[in-house]
Amino acid sequence: MDSKHVTESTSGQEDIQKTWWKEAIIYQIYPRSFQDSDGDGIGDLNGITSRLDYIQSLGVDIIWLNPIFLSPNDDNGYDISDYREIMREFGTMEDFDRLLKEIHKREMRLVLDLVVNHTSDEHPWFEEARKSRHNPYYNYYHWWPAEKGEPPLRLSYFDEEGNAWMYNKSTDSYYLHYFSRKQPDLNWENPEVRQEIFDMMRFWFDKGIDGFRMDSISLIAKDPSFPLIDSKKYPDIFSFYAKEPRLHLYLHEMNRQVLSKYDCMSVGEGSAVMVDDVAKFVDPAREELNMLYHFDAARIRNTTLPDNPESGIDYSLIALKKMFTEWDKAVDKGWPSIYLGNHDQPRMVSRFGSDKDEFRALSAKMLITFLLTMRGTPYWFAGDEIGMRNIRFDRIEDYNDIDTINRYKKAKAEGKDPQAVLDEQKETGRDLSLIHI
């Protein structure tokens, strides 16, 4: 792999810098369902190591692992209780070191998931924070004192009641959680929090990893005053949840203190980042991130629900082409990420092709060809290369995903038809793509 920077010119774009992560193919692995090495039914690090020759044979340059850190697994490992320990069912630090060594031996690279919008409520920081308002870790998180009354409305992705505030008796205050109740949001306003995160990143870079995929990174900056939201005056209410102006200051600080010190790759998950904003994240002159991936592709669906705009945009080739063209242009001097599916999305064959037996293989080849021939760095999800399709569940009891389960509970609590949730989740649920390979 050549990490030299060479200037090249492309149509309409000058001074694009060549580097290894622009010329790479990224293969995403959800460890739990990839390869089990010890017969306990759970994929693990040694299982991944045993499959490296296969992965290399695909032409893969970079492996991205979903979270492998210690976690109670309320949200598939995205609730981290220790950033410097390996999830026990995945193996040990020695297993990780062996995996990393074997990846590099094959001239591939390794990218880890960085989850720093929130921690687990079982992380030592939060266990201390929730004891007392006077605890030094209290300000590691966002709180609303009960004496100020009910907190201003903020919605949660995974809370069964939809409320992003949860009362904590010992501090007589509410903590913020944009995701589940067991995922309290970190307070990036606190410089001590930022330094803890930067130190943790250095720990993994010093071990030899090659980059981070940054989960929900657009959500880390909040206005700590939590103003009331007037949806009539401010139709883009998500600006109150994310993209707060300090976000770019934090990312630049991260780049200056950590990323710029290593030959590494950084890609951010751009929840609610609009096409007009993407250049702010990836313009090399701004020194923030290398790449950012967006969610507009996820809104184009083969199946949409009537009278439900959240269910997406009806699929058409024109809609898909228009969306990718807009994002490619908006990236400008930055570099695009190209993907059609991941751990949060249904299988690309089921969404953008046909998963019927007679068309499944053809669809998979067509979509992989698209990924590999677009300008940008392609990401594919393990199993796409064999045309894996969605599994479809008929009962809520079949689901493990907290998002699906809480959507179902919320619908029942509000007197809505829970079957409508099941019908939607058969097409869009996160569990659909996470079955064992």
Q: Across the structure, where does each feature detected by a protein language model lie?
A:
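Active-site and adjacent substrate-binding regions of carbohydrate-active enzymes
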Residues: 1-435
